[in-house]
Amino acid sequence: MKLTIDRSAFLRPLGHVQSVVERRNTIPILANVLLKARNGRVQLTATDMDMDILESVSCNILQEGSLTVPAHILYDIVRKLPEGAEVSLEADGENSRVLVLAGRSKFTLPFLPADEFPAMSDEELPCRFSLGSDDLKALIDKTRFAISNEETRYYLNGIFFHASKTSDVPMLRAVATDGHRLARVEIPLPEGAKEMPNIIIPRKAIAEVRKLIDDWSDDIDVSLSETKICFSIGDIILSTKLIDGTFPDYERVIPSGNDKNMRVS
């Protein structure tokens, strides 16, 4: 594999994928990012075995190929290079090394074979719909502060999403609670989401999705099953396992028939 790419164009997807990689890994290849260079693009993939992220970006490919390199180290190298630098990556198969060049800077990184990288699951995700980026931001921002950090109650370690009705109007609700406070927010149910199962998206996945959509203004394609959800955000695909548990009946703790209202702005 041999390619050249603009430093800024490479840094953005590297920042996204390295964020998924755990700092400590008992399986060495999980500390790596998979790079696949083909058809004028380099595809970056990372996983922690619960969550996968894939992103591709245009580059100048001199020799197609694929390999895996330490994600955090490569990100730190590219991040510290000067703006406007051209980055060159060249694999040395005999020594299992990757040469990273940029101007006078030269780095050598070890690599592991691409075929040792965990294969992404190909699960059928039958429920599909689109969400506006502002809607998804609101669903996350208005609930995630209430996500529990208590690992023993794992079913509270995420945001509960489900289809419901308010005054007979179909709605998509997001709910989070830590047992002391509860946040619930809803938006009109997107077309195609009527048959969606009740799901709990883990805290880490919520944080990663929120970072990815921070500067995104277009719609986000969502596909899901009872065990997995996938977000397509432009050239980025993030998928995660869902929390296998039952969210408590939160509506029982919300008082009804209140005759007093307060608006805070």
Model features per residue range: what roles?
Residues 1-265:
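Structural preference for solvent-exposed beta-strand-turn elements
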